[in-house]
């Protein structure tokens, strides 16, 4: 029968903590958005490490199916929640980015994906800021800049908003 000491001996490092992470948003090369990358990283309040999914193919054989792996489906979107400061620096940057892709008023914008897509990173950290695991989201751009709720009922909370990113694929560390 397993003992508590056996369990503790197998929890190397004490377990990864959900609140120890860093998100880095790199501005796109072709659109000036005015983002302070270091400050934006501090104002992230929530994110997630991505799921990994493989497709499957059912192969019928004498009334039953066997399954073999298929292609990867298109990736899910990735969402980051930011605190909103009184200068609206991050929100303004995200709106400038979207406006550079497709202008709010004129339906014009960047043509080449190389101008508006960039790489984003999320890193799982140890309690001493050592990077335990990282994911690079390749060729990403802000798909949705979420609403900010305004209400009289929340006098003691700082505004937050979500940005949902579309990316082409992600690259996890420690896999290859």
How would you describe each model-predicted region?
Residues 1-176:
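Glycine-rich, low-complexity intrinsically disordered segments
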């Amino acid at each position: 029968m397993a003992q508590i000491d056996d369990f503790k001996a197998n929890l190397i490092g004490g377990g990864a903590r959900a609140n120890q992470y860093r998100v880095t948003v790199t501005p796109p090369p072709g659109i000036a958005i005015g983002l302070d990358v270091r400050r934006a990283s501090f104002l992230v309040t929530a994110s997630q490490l991505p799921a990994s999914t493989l497709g499957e193919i059912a192969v019928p054989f004498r009334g039953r199916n066997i399954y073999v792996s298929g292609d990867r489906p298109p990736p899910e979107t990735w969402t980051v929640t930011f605190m909103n400061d009184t200068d609206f620096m991050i929100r303004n940057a995200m709106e400038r980015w979207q406006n550079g892709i497709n202008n709010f008023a004129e339906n014009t914008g960047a043509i080449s994906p190389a101008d508006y897509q960039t790489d984003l990173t999320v890193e799982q950290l140890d309690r001493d800021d050592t990077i335990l695991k990282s994911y690079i989201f390749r060729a990403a751009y802000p798909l949705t800049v979420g609403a900010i709720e305004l209400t009289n009922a929340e006098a003691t909370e700082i505004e937050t908003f979500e940005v949902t990113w579309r990316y082409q694929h992600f690259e996890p560390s420690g896999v290859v």
